[in-house]
C-alpha cells in the first residue's frame, strides 16, 4: 500500500509539471507575423527606388524597416501625376498597429 501511494504521488507530480509547462507555452503565444506597410507616394521610383522608399517610409512612420520594394503606378486618365507604391517590412513586428 505504501509503495502504491508513493508511485501515485510521483506520477501526479510529474503530470502536474507537464500540464503547467504546456500552459505557459500556450500563454506565451506564437511570435507576431511579419508586418508590411504599403503607401503610395508622388513621383516615380527612379533608379534607387528601394532607397527612396526606405527614406520615405522611415520619415512617415519614424520606425526602421528591414526591406522595401518600389513599384511605379500607371497614371490614371484623370490624374496625370506619376506615383509609386512603397511596400516595406517593419523591423519590429510588435509595432505593426502604430
UniProtKB/Swiss-Prot annotation:
It holds the Pfam family SCRL. The keyword Phosphoprotein does not apply. Expressed at least in stem, root, rosette leaves and flower buds. GO terms for cellular component: extracellular region. InterPro entries: SCRL. GO terms for biological process: defense response to fungus; killing of cells of another organism; signal transduction. Keywords: Antimicrobial, Disulfide bond, Fungicide, Plant defense, Secreted, Signal. Its main location: secreted. Belongs to the DEFL family. It comes from Arabidopsis thaliana (Mouse-ear cress). It is found in: Secreted. The gene is SCRL22. Residues 1-28 form the signal peptide. This is Putative defensin-like protein 233. Disulfide bonds join 35-96, 45-70, 53-86, 68-88.
Amino acid at each position: 500500500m505504501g509503495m502504491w501511494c508513493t508511485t501515485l504521488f510521483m506520477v501526479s507530480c510529474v503530470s502536474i509539471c507537464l500540464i503547467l509547462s504546456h500552459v505557459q507555452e500556450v500563454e506565451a503565444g506564437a511570435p507576431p507575423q511579419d508586418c508590411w506597410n504599403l503607401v503610395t507616394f508622388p513621383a516615380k521610383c527612379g533608379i534607387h527606388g528601394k532607397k527612396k522608399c526606405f527614406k520615405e517610409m522611415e520619415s512617415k512612420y519614424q520606425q526602421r524597416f528591414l526591406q522595401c520594394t518600389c513599384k511605379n503606378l500607371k497614371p490614371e486618365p484623370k490624374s496625370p501625376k506619376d506615383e509609386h507604391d512603397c511596400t516595406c517590412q517593419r523591423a519590429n513586428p510588435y509595432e505593426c498597429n502604430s
